[in-house]
């Protein structure tokens, strides 16, 4: 973790200034030394957030993304009109503004669309990063297809990855339902994680390429729990990723004088 260059990680700095206390104690405006919260790292909060982020495993592409980066008006219909996403946006904004209340109920989001590249993982990352910045809470981002590998990990001196997923304040299970067909024991593992989080009212975010009741290889007890602990957030069937990629290339071509 990078140490604040100003306070050296202490969170406080010493300043000299004249205050009414100088006049009261000494009868003049002499400067006295005071301890103040470091204005560079906001009293150590930057280090705290950075440390939390490093352990969260957010995809590198979205490491610094926040909800302000998510463009709700980028989605277009077949006629080129902007798709109304005000309902989805309202839920996400309420979640970030009133997280403590959502946390009390243990309710997260099930973000889905059939089309790839619509911004499901991006939105989940934006939400996670915003939560870490605002509330300083521990989060964990896990690709569902990597659960198999994580369940086999055993690192001496480190907490079991499955226990971490069961206990972190916010868990993201990304791309759930992929590469799981026929894996009954994987359903058992998923149910164990989700059931533990349900019992302890811990918030979970899911992303998927299908509606919950259409997930491939996921049995009813798992989907039932997912429905119980998450609010449905459908994203329009429009490739956010392709639009952004095309926009970036177009800007580059303009810069090169090719357009």
Feature roles, as predicted:
Residues 7, 70, 143, 174, ...:
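Conserved RecA-like P-loop NTPase ATPase core
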Residues 137-138, 167-170, 200-206:
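Loop/turn-to-beta-strand initiation segments
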Residues 79-90, 109, 114-115, 128-168, ...:
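Short glycine-rich substrate-engagement loop in P-loop NTPases that contacts/grips substrate
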Residues 104-123:
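Walker A/P-loop nucleotide-binding motif
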Residues 96-100, 149-171, 176, 188-196, ...:
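Conserved alpha-helical scaffold flanking the Walker A/P-loop in AAA+ ATPase domains
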Residues 1-90, 94, 237, 241-259:
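A short, basic N-terminal segment
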Residues 90-103, 107:
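Pre-Walker A adenine-sensing motif
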């Amino acid at each position: 973790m990078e140490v604040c260059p100003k306070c050296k990680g202490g969170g406080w700095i010493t300043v000299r200034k004249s205050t009414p206390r100088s006049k009261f104690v000494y009868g003049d405006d002499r400067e006295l030394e005071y301890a103040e919260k470091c204005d560079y790292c906001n009293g150590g909060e930057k280090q705290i957030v950075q440390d939390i982020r490093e352990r969260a495993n957010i995809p590198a592409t979205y490491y610094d993304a926040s909800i302000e980066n998510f463009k709700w008006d980028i989605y277009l219909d077949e006629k080129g009109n902007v798709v109304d996403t005000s309902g989805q946006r309202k839920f996400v904004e309420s979640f970030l503004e009133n997280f403590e209340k959502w946390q009390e109920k243990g309710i997260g989001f099930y973000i889905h669309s059939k089309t790839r590249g619509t911004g499901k993982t991006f939105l989940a990352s934006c939400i996670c990063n915003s939560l870490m910045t605002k509330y300083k809470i521990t989060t964990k981002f896990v690709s569902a297809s990597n659960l198999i590998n994580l369940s086999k990990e055993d690192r001496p001196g480190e907490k079991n990855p499955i226990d971490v997923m069961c206990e972190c304040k916010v868990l993201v299970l990304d791309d759930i339902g992929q590469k799981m067909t026929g894996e009954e024991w994987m359903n058992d593992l998923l149910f164990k994680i989700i059931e533990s989080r349900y019992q302890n009212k811990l918030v979970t975010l899911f992303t998927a390429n299908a509606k919950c009741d259409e997930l491939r290889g996921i049995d009813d007890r798992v989907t039932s729990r997912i429905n119980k602990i998450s609010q449905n957030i459908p994203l329009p069937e429009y490739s956010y990723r392709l639009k952004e990629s095309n926009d970036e290339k177009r800007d580059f071509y303009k810069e090169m004088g090719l357009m």
